Amino acid sequence: MEAITVMELKTLLDSAPDEIALVDVRNPAEAEVASIEGSHLVPLASLESGEAIDRVRGLAEGRRLLVHCKLGGRSARAVELLSQQGIAATNVTGGIDAWSQHVDPAIPRY
């Protein structure tokens, strides 16, 4: 499984934001507490049910698809599910928790 760190994600967001699509697979309540600017909320359950596959396919069109969650476990599962649907995706290791520790301490940890 392809993976990147939050520092690598920050570099991509700063240098080529139009070339990536960042998907957040946490629950809506979690996203209300903390989120990375520009991310698209697509809860893991909606990928597991299949209802959001086409939406993510559209987001990924012509862009590198990056997936994050709180710590990296749910996003790894999402990357697996997307791969099974023929959609290439990269896991953001450490998730938003690592983002708040290493990139933007203003993002609350929960």
Predicted ranges, named:
Residues 67-68:
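Short, surface-exposed ligand- or partner-binding patches at beta-edge/loop junctions that are enriched
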Residues 1-21, 25-64, 73-110:
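Rhodanese-like catalytic fold shared by cysteine-dependent sulfurtransferases
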